Amino acid sequence: MILIADSGATTPTWCALDRGAVVTQFESEGYNPNYITLDYMVADIRKALPADFDPRTVDHVYFYGAGVTELQYGFVREAIAQVMPDAEIFVAMDLLASARALLGRKPGFAAILGTGTNSCLYDGERITLNIDSLGFILGDEGSGAYMGKRMLVDYVRGRVSDEARRVIEASVPYNGDEIIDIIYTKPFPNRFCGQYGKLIHDNLAIPYFHDLAEDSFCQLFEQIISLYPDYRSYAFNCVGSVGWYFQDVLRPVVERYGMRIGNLLRTPMEGLIRYHRED
């Protein structure tokens, strides 16, 4: 049996395949090796397993984690091994999951547009080039957190239209000082800003919000995608909630910058199931 884990920034999704057929799917808590202990991860995986699922039947585990670097692969591998001792365990960053889900074993360009941003060139087996998105503070252009951060800055500085201000006031129960306190002193400021991606999406008919989303995608191209050599020769393939739900704004920007639209997926799991069925 194969077990695939797509561990995003908040909730990992697990899917078990037996002879290519989906046996079960379940969710667990988010895992950032920088902030959790080994015991916590082991206990949480065990707690998340369905009652009728026997971990001893798992032969291979493919764990793709957001923010998981090579330095942390051993930590994740050890945690999973304590729950599934007979399994061969593969650990990689979520960017490889996105490339495999979007492109399978074909070369091309792949991007993630969700709470954060990432992108790469992929040769059908491995990532060959990754222009660093630099994370929430320095970059992540085009992401939900980037849009939310810009909206909050404009709101606090009074640079939004009256119509947009009324919408924001109805959904953001904080003044400027409180927003600053949350961003600089509370955990996960990226998630705090990213939650307002839905507000922006739901109000795209208001020019301020549409222009904000459009410019965020333009900055994605200006600051990241245009740095890939000969980027216009690739199709734009993307996975993530922002890329999926903002398609009507994203597609014209992609075409304006000379790329053609390829595959757009809300989550990578469906593509990962396809990919690992061929193993």
Question: For the regions a protein language model found, what residue spans apply to each?
Answer:
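ATP-binding/phosphotransfer module of carbohydrate and carboxylate kinases, centering on a glycine-rich
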Residues: 1-61, 79, 83, 99-109, ...
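Phosphate-binding/catalytic loop of phosphoryl-transfer enzymes
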Residues: 69-163
